Amino acid sequence: MLLPKRVKYRREHRGNMRGEAKGGKEVSFGEWGLQAQTASWITNRQIESARIAMTRYMKRGGKVWIKIFPHKPYTKKPLEVRMGSGKGSPEGWVAVVKPGKIMFEIAGVSEEVAREALRLASHKLPVKCKIVKRQETGGESNES
């Protein structure tokens, strides 16, 4: 499970998830990526579940990069407790994902295997996803 080693504050505000992702919109390490189309919190358990689904389908071949990390603690009050009397205790960790963010990347496998592995991973996540291919950059120059 992914979780921070230590944090400055145990509890955080919920925040908002308006707008698109600021960075991490391109496939930078692998050949194929899984891109979020909607905004959501993704828990450390969901990230781990998606990772296991991908690696099992690839039969330990290729390489997987996880590009999101659950830095944000979320809290929950116990069941049947009245409102008030402070914020609840930390329940788990989430990664805030906005539209356009590349969450996972894959390299070292064929296109069919990569597409199917990312499709299986997308079913484990609470966001709509799109499978994207790496864009080659810096090929030609305009000088003559």
Swiss-Prot record:
Record key words, sorted: Ribonucleoprotein, Ribosomal protein, RNA-binding, rRNA-binding, tRNA-binding
UniProt keyword annotation of Ribonucleoprotein present: yes
Any one Gene Ontology BP term: translation
GO molecular function: rRNA binding; structural constituent of ribosome; tRNA binding
InterPro entries: Ribosomal_uL16, Ribosomal_uL16_bact-type, Ribosomal_uL16_CS, Ribosomal_uL16_dom, Ribosomal_uL16_sf
GO cellular component, one term: cytosolic large ribosomal subunit
Matches recorded under PANTHER family: 50S/60S RIBOSOMAL PROTEIN L16, LARGE RIBOSOMAL SUBUNIT PROTEIN UL16M
Function: Binds 23S rRNA and is also seen to make contacts with the A and possibly P site tRNAs.
Assembly information from the UniProt record: Part of the 50S ribosomal subunit.
Family, as annotated: Belongs to the universal ribosomal protein uL16 family.
Protein name (database record): Large ribosomal subunit protein uL16
Organism of provenance: Lysinibacillus sphaericus (strain C3-41)
